[in-house]
């Protein structure tokens, strides 16, 4: 299992998206983030697509997307950005 750390900027973006939308979309965001967190903790290198830079990846779970960095040596995943689409 990996430790999943959401950087403050990503958490702020998640909170902003959550409060600025309607209840049905909030439910979608909550379920998407729950799925993403589960995959980040269990298999982050198999989630989403790689990006330039060591351990950098991007993943989508409608209606959300995240950018994250996997540090295999320490077993830590850092979510660096969050947005909705």
Placement of each model-derived feature along the sequence:
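Basic, Lys/Arg-enriched alpha-helical interface segments
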Residues: 1-65, 71-85
